[in-house]
């Protein structure tokens, strides 16, 4: 089957924003204007098409990135048909994992900002993630019809808070109630949308007289930004004092894809103005899969290899999202980087070392689906019938292996015990939890050996609350949930230069003999665990060395202070001995475990607690109270900024243990007028009095 849309006309984009910037409404309008759905969904009444999980519709927040395909021929029908794959990303901090995983497979992003609130804490998180994956982006200032809307203020914030380089492509005509349209700085014409047709019709007109001066000033900046793309254009600009429309668009496209600038637009999605021009900008300035460098990976021997976005290349794709669907079962969303995949094909998963057969292939629209026969390079689609794939894994050609760079998933910082309410729920709960953990790598499930309880861990209170809720709705499991617990860690502060572990059992016949001498050293934060084999002269035979490493690794999940996982430790095996008859792997595992535990005791073990970056936006009257409260929670206030339009943003670093129930507390302190976001920053040593309490509580 030949390609319907050339790859140059693909755009894989994400719509990303702070919680209330109006991202879902913006996405809805995109789907409406591209002719996908004919009744506009509104988030307020819970009918938005992209928010297809029940909890999202109840809470009015977007949790899962649904992927949707739409087609666009331009606002004035002046482009050949382009295919836009939209990945909807969540705007809540507990779901940064979702943002992160969608950034990994995007080619470009539209960052939506509120014209009143401007750049908010979550906007910075999302911006950092887009930087990390080098995603070209454009900015859309939404809610221009709201009281206090100010496009140019948001422009200043993008420069100061995000250190972005925004280049307005349009400027607003009016603001608040009088916002009627935009001045297109490329065409130097006014665009006024027709309200009766819900913005599907528009007309170009002359720039209003009172805006001519402002429009000329911003047009000048736009042309300068374009001219800076090459010496040739700069010379042309200097000679003629101007550039034509094609020159400007080609130059801005080059600079946007290179990450040097971010085209900036504005409108009000709710009132059907401006989104249409933003879609044109997506086509004009954001990259197609062919514009971005070939994807990097490794072959079976670990050598670097590349695959370019071409149907003729061997197949490679990344599974970036798993979902349970009530009708078809498990759906795996994949981004195809190279080659072609047909239903019925067999593919290889290099991480699991397994082959899988592809069942049906689906092209998703927010909550309905179209069955397709094949997917091509650059496509995003859903596969039915994969059994062993987890989020972040590669699928590739069975004869031409490639392992694409894996996604990084944060470690969970909060845990809760869950217990099924009845015997009937017991079996279903195990299945439900393993399915949810497969979908979401930042959610972990384990069973506590001492208490026999099932412990779930995640990125925040809301994250776990929603997963327990999904367990009830999707799997029919009723469960009781314990109090949230902090995920502490243990590490060492000093070296232990020599510690011995000896496991000897002499009984009639075959005994056990393992003897190791280790050196333990602390690693810098985030160092994890490192094992070094420094054995000389075969005092410990080669075949037992992996057993020593394994013995230590099996000891790591439960430290000696309070049974929390041990991190940031380097263990060096440098001496030992063995017995010709009695030595075996098990004996060396036991000896290593004994040595490691004793070594930790001698190396100043300490308890680490998760520290959270907290940002509170509050009216000025309550700023002192909020700061006092954060300090009383062992928080370190790191700064306070003014919010445009009044109020303060307070930044602090606070231990997670002190932040439970903070939302309720903050509401009562500020009469419900403050909001906050919180994300994991790093682990830090817990003060002695806190550590003593935690250790005592665990010892009970």
UniProtKB/Swiss-Prot annotation:
As given in the record, the signal peptide range reads: none
Enumerate the subcellular locations listed in this protein's record, separating them with semicolons: Cytoplasm
Can you name a GO cellular component term?
Answer: cytoplasm
A single Gene Ontology biological process assigned to it is: ribosome disassembly
Q: Which PROSITE patterns does this entry report, sorted A to Z?
A: G_TR_1 (PS00301), G_TR_2 (PS51722)
Domain tr-type G, by residue range, is: 8-290
Its principal location? cytoplasm
Pfam families the UniProt entry points to: EFG_C, EFG_III, EFG_IV, GTP_EFTU, GTP_EFTU_D2
| Keyword Protein biosynthesis set for record | yes
Q: Does the keyword Transport apply?
A: no
Q: What's the superkingdom here?
A: Bacteria
**Residues where GTP binds:** 17-24, 88-92, 142-145
Ordered alphabetically, the record's keywords are: Cytoplasm, Elongation factor, GTP-binding, Nucleotide-binding, Protein biosynthesis
Q: Which GO terms describe its molecular function?
A: GTP binding; GTPase activity; guanosine tetraphosphate binding; translation elongation factor activity
Functional description taken from the UniProt entry? Catalyzes the GTP-dependent ribosomal translocation step during translation elongation. During this step, the ribosome changes from the pre-translocational (PRE) to the post-translocational (POST) state as the newly formed A-site-bound peptidyl-tRNA and P-site-bound deacylated tRNA move to the P and E sites, respectively. Catalyzes the coordinated movement of the two tRNA molecules, the mRNA and conformational changes in the ribosome.
Family listed:
Belongs to the TRAFAC class translation factor GTPase superfamily. Classic translation factor GTPase family. EF-G/EF-2 subfamily.
For this entry, the protein name equals Elongation factor G 1
């Amino acid at each position: 089957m030949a390609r319907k849309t050339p790859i140059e006309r693909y755009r894989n984009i994400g719509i990303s924003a702070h919680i209330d910037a109006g991202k879902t409404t913006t996405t809805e309008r995109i789907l409406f204007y591209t002719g996908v759905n004919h009744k506009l969904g509104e988030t307020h009444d819970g009918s938005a098409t992209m928010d297809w999980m029940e909890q999202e519709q109840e809470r009015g927040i977007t949790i899962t990135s649904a992927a949707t395909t739409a087609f666009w021929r331009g606002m004035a029908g002046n482009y050949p048909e382009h295919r836009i794959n939209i990945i909807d990303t969540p705007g809540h901090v507990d779901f940064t994992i979702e943002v992160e995983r969608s950034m990994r497979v995007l080619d470009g992003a539209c960052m939506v900002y509120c014209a009143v609130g401007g750049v908010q804490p979550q906007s910075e998180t999302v911006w950092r993630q887009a930087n990390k994956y080098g995603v070209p982006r454009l900015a859309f200032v939404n809610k221009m019809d709201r009281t206090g809307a100010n496009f140019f203020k948001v422009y200043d914030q993008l420069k100061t808070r995000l250190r972005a380089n925004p280049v307005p492509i349009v400027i607003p005509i009016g603001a608040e109630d009088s916002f009627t349209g935009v001045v297109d700085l490329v065409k130097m014409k006014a665009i006024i949308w027709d309200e009766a047709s819900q913005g599907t019709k528009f007309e170009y007109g002359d720039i209003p007289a009172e805006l001519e001066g402002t429009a000329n000033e911003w047009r000048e900046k736009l042309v300068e930004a374009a001219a800076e793309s090459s010496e040739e254009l700069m010379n042309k600009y200097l000679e003629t004092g101007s550039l034509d429309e094609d020159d400007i668009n080609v130059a801005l496209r080059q600079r946007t894809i290179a990450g040097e600038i971010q085209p900036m637009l504005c409108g009000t999605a709710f009132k059907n103005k401006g989104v249409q021009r933003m879609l044109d900008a997506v086509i004009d300035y954001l990259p197609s899969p062919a514009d971005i460098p070939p994807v990097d990976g490794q072959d079976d021997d670990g050598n670097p290899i590349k695959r370019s976005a071409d149907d003729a290349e061997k197949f490679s794709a990344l599974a970036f999202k798993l979902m349970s669907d009530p009708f078809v079962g498990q759906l795996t969303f994949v981004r195809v980087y190279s080659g072609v995949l047909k239903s019925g094909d067999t593919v290889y998963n290099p991480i699991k070392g397994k082959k899988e057969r592809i069942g049906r292939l689906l092209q998703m629209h927010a909550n309905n689906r179209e069955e397709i026969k094949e997917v091509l390079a650059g496509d995003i689609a859903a596969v039915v019938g994969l059994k062993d794939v987890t989020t972040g894994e590669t699928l590739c050609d069975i004869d031409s292996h490639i392992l694409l760079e894996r996604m990084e998933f944060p470690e969970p910082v909060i845990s809760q015990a869950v217990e099924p309410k009845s015997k009937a729920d017991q079996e279903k709960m195990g299945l439900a939890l393993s399915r949810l953990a497969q979908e979401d790598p930042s959610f972990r499930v384990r069973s506590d050996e001492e208490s026999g309880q099932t412990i779930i861990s995640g990125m925040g209170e809301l994250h776990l609350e929603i997963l327990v809720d999904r367990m009830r709705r999707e799997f029919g499991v009723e469960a009781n949930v314990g109090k949230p617990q902090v995920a502490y860690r243990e590490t060492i502060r000093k070296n232990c230069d020599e510690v011995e572990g000896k496991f000897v059992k002499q009984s009639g016949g075959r005994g056990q003999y393992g003897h190791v001498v280790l050196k333990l050293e602390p690693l810098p934060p985030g160092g994890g665990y490192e094992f070094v084999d420094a054995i000389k002269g075969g005092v410990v035979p080669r075949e037992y060395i992996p057993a020593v490493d394994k013995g230590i690794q099996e000891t790591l999940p439960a430290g000696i202070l309070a049974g929390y996982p041990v991190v940031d430790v380097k263990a060096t095996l440098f001496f030992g001995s063995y017995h010709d008859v009695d030595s075996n792997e098990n004996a060396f595992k036991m000896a290593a475990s004994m040595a490691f535990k004793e070594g930790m005791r001698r190396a100043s073990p300490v308890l680490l607690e998760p520290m959270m970056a907290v940002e509170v936006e509050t009216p000025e009257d309550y700023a002192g109270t909020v700061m006092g409260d954060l300090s009383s929670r062992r928080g370190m206030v790191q700064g306070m900024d003014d919010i445009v339009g009044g109020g303060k943003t307070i930044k602090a670093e606070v231990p997670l243990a002190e932040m439970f129930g903070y939302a309720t507390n903050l509401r009562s302190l500020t009469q419900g007028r403050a909001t906050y976001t919180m994300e994991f920053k790093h682990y830090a040593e817990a003060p002695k009095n806190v550590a003593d309490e935690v250790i005592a509580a665990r010892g009970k």
